[in-house]
Amino acid sequence: MACTGPSLSGAFDILGAAGQDKLLYLKHKLKTLRPGCRGAYLLHAMVLLKLGQETEARISLEALKADAVAQLVARQWAGVDSTETPEEPPDLSWAVARVYHLLTEEKLCPATMREEAYRAALRAFRSRDDLQLGELQEEARDRCGWDVLGDLGGVQTLRSDLGCLPPSSASLSRTRSDPRPIEHLSGWSTACSLRSTGSPASLGSNLEISQSPTMALLSVHHSHHGPSKLCDHPQASVVPEPAPMGCQEPEEMSWPPSVEAADSPVRPSSPGPGLPEVTTDACPASPHDPPEVPEISAHYPVECTDVPAAPKSLPSPSKNTCLVTDQTPVQLSEEDTAYLSAQPRPPTPSVPQTSPSFPSASTSPFPSPSTPPEAHPTPSKAHPTPPKAHSTPPKAHPTSPKAHPTSPKAHPTVWNPEPPPPELESSEQKFYNFVVLHASADEHIALRVRERLEALGVHDGATFCEDFQVPGRGELHCLQDALDHSAFIILLLTSNFDCRLSQHQTNQSLMSSLTRHGWQDCVIPFLPLESSLAQLSPSTSSLLTGLVLLDEHSKIFARKVTNTFKPQMLRARKAKWRKEQDARALREQSQQLESERQHAAAWGAAYSAYVHSYLAYQTQVEKLQVALANYMPFGTQLPFGGQGSLGTPPSSFPTLPGHQPPPLPPWLGGTPPPIFPQPPQTFPQPPPTFPQPPPTFQQPPPACPQPLDFSQAPPARPQSPGLQPLIIHHAQMVQLGVNNHMWNQRGTQAPEDNTRETE
């Protein structure tokens, strides 16, 4: 049964009730946490003690010599002999709180026990005025929320007391009362920033005045301890906020839309002191001008914290580098990936999010103004700047100079840095210090051997079944990966290590050690406790006769392990492995570039052939034009004459006597033909491709049907460059037909023809 109060014994009771599977999961998880998460190593040692692995627990506690709490655990629970009397360390309560925090994250205890542990630590540190109280308060606030600091004995309710300072004679006007130093600090609460009850929404503004003397405001530690002080001179970015006027519920305090709220009358029944008045200017302040301090009249002093002159974004609320605060899932080592994949991983608990400094319209408890802030910009006088939470201001995001200093868009609602670009998941295999090759029936022995070697100081080990034997992949490919990505190959010699696959693994391992440069003596035959030399087959024994066995039965087994797996040799082989991987990547990249180069060369050759054929075609067309010009009648202009370039449409067409030149059809002039045939609006004209009669032709007699004479011909469309004229010589009659209409024209017989007939 777990203890009711937060203590180390209570944490041990919680671990005892968790179960064997959960403790094994915690063992592998806590071992891989980064050093920034304090309390993980202590809890890891406690888990080892609960699992009965006292030797490993003592090794872990021995590594924490500087931790007094770890030494206390070693003396009381690990059975470490010590002549000194166990004394309770001063930071025991803090260490217990961190342990309970990790237990809460693993769903082993409720969050109320973690809060109680942090409250006990805060009370202990506050009672002796410890210098680390500020850091403890920040950690408790980040992990347990704001309320964990509200019910401590040393923190009082912040109120406006009329007896501390003489009331100001100034009324609600544009004048500002002179600041006076606070002489007696006993009647005042601890110097802290102010916020509304139950919501940290006032973090964006450093000051918030209570609505009435009867409403308690929780004081939250937001700066280092020290006497409260009034600002001697107005800071460029420190501006008090106006108090809500004439109502019990607070109004929008970050950006008031106008000055009407400041001029509203005060309720007569309100017993509170005089309220300040915020004055605004007619024109907004320039972004380059520093904001001024508003002229207010107050009956009580308020605390001002030092802030930088330039407006900055809210800093990060936490300095803790623990994994929980970073809100990133715990990444386990490669050696425990396969083990943890088989175990049901508990869901990642939710982490308290930092509340926005300026609440949005949908979530803010304050009523939104009827007029948007863009329509009525407020001068920088009445706008408060977010305070500095720590003594050293963190790096803030640059503010655009075009943004107005009083516009809500110029201030981020949450200090949310730009997320880094997503890193591409690397397909590179991890390098292991050793890999255990075993038969399929010896998986449990291989896992035990790996844990034994890791406990002796040889970290980053692997087993063939756990890290390389991927389902769906070839067995030989998995074996080659194990040989390529490990410093030592351990052959687990048992009675089952006698099949053909095991013999093949042995042969491949020996050949790799002989042919791979720098990997000599990398094959280690391992004789576990579950086996003996008599159980080995003759073929295996004869094959490994020339190698020295690593016998787990030996009394100097630990020393042999230390001499075999030397850190210098492991680092050297990892460096060589890294060079091999880089060389392999360069070879693959060069092969890809060569393939792309050949592809580009093929495209270039194809394009060159196309250009060559096009130029040959163009030359042939020009020759045909020159030959065609020799057969044209004198005075007839070629559509593709020597004056124009290739593809230039003709300037004019020869026309029939008494007729207008015909227009091109729409589909020849660049316009697509209609979907449905359209009836002709006018009588069709002969296309320009038909030959024109020579000038010697006469008009036909009146008896012959003549084509209609159109008074207004449609405008000529752009001529197609592909049309060629048809030339007819020595014809007495020419008949033309277009769209089911035909007409003809007769001419006089040529003189040479008459001569021939006479003869």
UniProtKB/Swiss-Prot annotation:
Region of interest: TRIF-NTD: 1-153
For whether the record's keyword set contains Isomerase, the answer is no
- Kindly list the biological process annotations in GO that this record carries: apoptotic process; defense response to virus; inflammatory response; innate immune response; positive regulation of canonical NF-kappaB signal transduction; positive regulation of myeloid dendritic cell cytokine production; positive regulation of type I interferon production; response to exogenous dsRNA
- The UniProt regions of compositional bias labelled Pro residues, in chain numbering, are 366-376, 659-705
Which InterPro entries does the entry mention? RHIM, TCAM1/2, TICAM1, TIR_dom, Toll_tir_struct_dom_sf, TRIF_N
In this chain, composition skew of type Low complexity spans 351-365
Q: What residue intervals hold the motif TRAF6-binding?
A: 84-91, 248-255, 299-309
Q: Where is this region: Sufficient to induce apoptosis?
A: 549-759
MF terms from GO for this chain are: signaling adaptor activity
According to the UniProt entry, which residues carry Phosphoserine?
210
Whom does it interact with, and what assembly results?
A: Homodimer. Found in a multi-helicase-TICAM1 complex at least composed of DHX36, DDX1, DDX21 and TICAM1; this complex exists in resting cells with or without poly(I:C) RNA ligand stimulation. Interacts (via TIR domain) with DDX21 (via C-terminus). Interacts (via TIR domain) with DHX36 (via C-terminus). Interacts with AZI2 and IRF7. Interacts with TICAM2 in TLR4 recruitment. Interaction with PIAS4 inhibits the TICAM1-induced NF-kappa-B, IRF and IFNB1 activation. Interacts with IKBKB and IKBKE. Interaction with SARM1 blocks TICAM1-dependent transcription factor activation. Interacts with TRAF3.
Tell me the domain comment: The pLxIS motif constitutes an IRF3-binding motif: following phosphorylation by TBK1, the phosphorylated pLxIS motif of TICAM1 recruits IRF3. IRF3 is then phosphorylated and activated by TBK1 to induce type-I interferons and other cytokines. The N-terminal region is essential for activation of the IFNB promoter activity.
Name recorded for this polypeptide: TIR domain-containing adapter molecule 1
Source organism (scientific name): Bos taurus (Bovine)
What is the gene name?
TICAM1
